[in-house]
């Protein structure tokens, strides 16, 4: 479809009208360029897909929504906007689209959040009730569900009143009533515990109401995991050919796709025997109490017992073999080099893939039949069996995927990382098996790039080391296929608005020098804190261990620090904002996740402290396998893997400081390798251009601490 004069005029008119809706709106050339590039791509005028890096301040969300909505209407398609986290998803749904509705009055939009973000009305009704009969409803749903106390009951009653009175849409983030994680776990549900159409509350269930709204919406705000799952199952969203797709925070997409290719499951022989026995009893119960119209052949007790016995024998053999490979210690790990399994193990995995898939099919067959049973049955008993069968289906589905992945030599032309772990839980030894595909470009090509005609991949950070090459390798997007890669200029004057401070540290932040380095860092940080020049500060760490050691060094000012994990992130940010706005000092302290999606403008954040260059963990089985594979191809893992990842992380961390034209401040990086190593200048060149200062660090005397024990990845 060509961009007609009428369509261009519509986009221009909406953009002009938008300026009247936003106070102090500043027209920006990068924003106009992005609108034009997005429009040309979605209309099919130029290229297949577009990867466009839009730095903070460009206004990327509105830059893709305006042309996206206009073209979706013209082509009678649905615009799907996908994000990587709930915060941005909710911002688009609750802020950006309502703003656009002021200039596009008939705009229809909805959000497709994950099931776990919505309240389960069945659970809410039971927890809100003071009637024992209502609470008894939950007895068969969750054996571990703890009874609510009076305070929780009152809170749930208020939530139920808001839900029934249409004052609340059922989303956790859309209520002012405080809900801690433990209570929300009981108020929400997951796929295995959902009765779906069999539930008495199905018609008014917030989750299913939202899913039904998708069919009528012009714009659907989703997340990457849901989009990937929807493309795989052809459910939830319209057909790919009827979509316009925008992947915001698109740098996360390869990781989300990799998560779909990451399987871990317990394979302890005794545990597995218990699960198989429970499933056999469940099948027998279903046959006796809710006999299906057509009996699956495998439901025959003798056949099922023989089938399960073969599964168990294979699992027991695999346990014995894996225990020979793992060290003698109770907690141990063994990774298979290049993901290559011994022939004996590979044969077991291939056989288990077939056997567990057959059990998955049997559970699915029973579940489909149970879901069609009429009200003539005991509803509580029926629902109990449905939920138990749902759980069995989920377990065998996960097992089937695990063994299929274990049976693969390669995925997307790269090895599948495979390893086993043995660990102690509640005094008992447990064995787990893990598989992760280290490349996902084939999956993305099949589900997205080949299926959806035109896709926009955007983020404030898509490049590392000033190059799109890492994104291209991980995602499978390529110029040869007609994909375009655009990097927009930042609208900010970083030279005038900030500076980069690299203190003259005596120690590099290596594992051997960690104690001395953190002591130096704490001394400089304390000096900055005592100067009282900055009210809003952020301290970012590459590891939880380093963060905890730092906190020990500054324990006397702990009350000023708002530390990741103390409370939910949104509450920490809210408290930080209140403190600074009331004239107090406040310091947010967190890990890499705090380097993304944190938007604190002006005085709310004027100094960012970065512990060190965040290279990927060297003890990760996935990273090690990828390194082995790269070496086998005569490629240097540090150049292909570690340095681009570190560059990307550093760009995001530094990007927390300048969020608007009014922002002023400095970024402190406690890593002298930026100035002493050959790669340091390359990392600096990929950052915004700041003037650099190198102040002295206070003298610190610290005794070297014993080298910390290496932690296993689980």
Swiss-Prot record:
It is an enzyme of class 5 (isomerase). Its EC number is 5.6.2.3. SUPFAM superfamilies: P-loop containing nucleoside triphosphate hydrolases. Keywords: 4Fe-4S, ATP-binding, DNA-binding, Helicase, Hydrolase, Iron, Iron-sulfur, Isomerase, Metal-binding, Nucleotide-binding. It catalyses: Couples ATP hydrolysis with the unwinding of duplex DNA at the replication fork by translocating in the 5'-3' direction. This creates two antiparallel DNA single strands (ssDNA). The leading ssDNA polymer is the template for DNA polymerase III holoenzyme which synthesizes a continuous strand; ATP + H2O = ADP + phosphate + H(+). This is ATP-dependent DNA helicase DinG. A motif (DEAH box) lies at residues 248-251. Gene3D superfamilies: P-loop containing nucleotide triphosphate hydrolases. Its cofactor is [4Fe-4S] cluster. Residues 517-698 form the Helicase C-terminal domain. DNA-dependent ATPase and 5'-3' DNA helicase. Unwinds D-loops, R-loops, forked DNA and G-quadruplex DNA. Binds 1 [4Fe-4S] cluster. Belongs to the helicase family. DinG subfamily. Type 1 sub-subfamily. HAMAP family: DinG_proteobact. One of its GO terms (molecular function) is ATP hydrolysis activity. Residues 17-294 form the Helicase ATP-binding domain. GO terms for biological process: DNA repair; SOS response. It comes from Salmonella choleraesuis (strain SC-B67). Signal peptide: none annotated. [4Fe-4S] cluster binds at residues 120, 194, 199, 205. ATP binds at residues 54-61.
